[in-house]
């Protein structure tokens, strides 16, 4: 039986591109820029039966200021350069509800409760939920770009609560957490600090 990839015969009819970039602001904070772009490659009929031409149907930009301990969203802005209806832009300010939200396990559920309902936008919600993982990677890239001391506890590792139990490798009793705990204990032994 052929693979699903081998069954593709025509060009795409739709594309969704998600793009994330992280920019340093200062020693403790980064700005993360996210973009969601939906494009249709053929004309289509809208809900009212009107023919619409192909092209970009959604283009949404989200900017997050990330930092603090525990790691949190310190500020948030959204732009909606391309939406299918003018009314969509009324949901743009809903993103302000996430300011102060900690980046930890359960983040996606909290986002859905805050902005993923009839007061918000499904596309901005999706962008934010996917974006936070990229935000963590960007934050860590920024923090790890310079030598730093071994943390004295797991609590000193920004963003760690988001990762714990997020997948098999990052499970609470898994190899990565165990390795970090051993590194902390070894550092305490070397420096003479009581565990």
Where are these regions (language model features)?
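Active-site- and interface-proximal helix/loop "cap" or "latch" segments in soluble metabolic
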Residues: 3, 14-15, 22-24, 36-195
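A short hydrophobic beta-strand element
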Residues: 29-36
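Generic structural signal for residues positioned in beta-strands
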Residues: 19-21, 31
